[in-house]
Amino acid sequence: MEFIGHFRRLTAEQRNTFIACFLGWSLDAFDFFILIFCVSALAANFHEKVSTIMQAAFWTLAMRPLGAFLFGMMADRVGRRPTLMLNIIAYSMFELASAFAPTFHVFLITRALFGIAMGGEWGVGAALAFETLPAEGRGFFSGLLQEGYVVGYLIAGLVYGTVFRFVGWRGMFVIGATPAVLAVFVLRKVKESPAWLQGQAWKKSGEHTGQGIWLRVFAFLKNIRSHAGIFIFLVVLMFAFNSFSHGTQDLYPTFLQKNLAFSPGTVSFIVIVYNLGALAGGILFGNLSEKIGRRRTIIVAALLAIPAIPLWAYSHHVGLLAVGGFLMQFMVQGAWGVIPAHLNELSPPGVRGTLPGFAYQTGNLLSSWNSVIQAQVAENRFGGSFAPVLAWTVVVIAAMVAIVTALGHEQRGADLTTTS
């Protein structure tokens, strides 16, 4: 009932804003995970190894910092709302372009361009959401917003299980273009961030009127340098977190398909179950962070992922794998559920539209080769078996998440109503 109470306290404007940001992130993730479910089909179509196909995921992740930088600058300059609309349309169109790639190299280019668009959404959406929502219940909304990523994964799993056999991988990417319609909802129902509007007063003085793009880039980099300590910490933290999520998610459907020879329907069932666990974990741990603190919540969730490894990686029964997956993603996304609020609270007001997303995606860049390395190690050291690689990934990265988090600090309840 407490969860319902948080929503009831929102105004209609705040609800619409949160829904738009949640769906923007969900559908962004949906488009990314379509690739993850189609790895085996792409390998067969383009006559490449799994490790080669995973380069498409690498280029998507590697280009996300550029998107976070460009769209973040745009959000700080012209507003969160129009930037979010452009962002949604862009990632939908590049997803559609992927469906018609005639060769693997062209496919890689479309995925790199998709990565630029994907990289912009999280930072812009999170800034718009948390600058509009009240401070009360921020931990709950942080967990729920981050689990938009899980909802996207869940939708991709449902679509894969029901229509892949009829439309193939190209049809899946065509379906991935449908999120573009969300831009209409943003146009009609969402208002600009009140914090961003308030922050425009200093620009109206004329001091910054007509700034060129390079002057704005220089000003941003100067801001980053003045906050170098927190920026470096956030990048390292996001490297650990992105390795945690992508290391447990990106190759898991391929593990179920290739190592265990499960059908699309069975894979879809397991994916749905563990994403329900992820959704519950993100919301519950996000809410818990309001009571026991951001850092303590992250550390508990990360370390509790380790005991789930035997069921998650070494079971052969569908039911046990589903339980293991549920527990694993409950913890992984439980830790992630704290991040949107934590990063925005730690970020200085003047660069909140850019810094959290840029740090997030820079950390993503550093971890972007993760799935390729996992696939190569499985192919070269374990005869194509993904289980030991997945298991060791969790042990090492969960410990890293806990250690880095413990070394940082938090500003739970910080004022996010101003951008200057």
Where are these regions (language model features)?
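Helix-loop-helix hairpin linking two adjacent transmembrane segments in secondary transporters
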Residues: 145-188
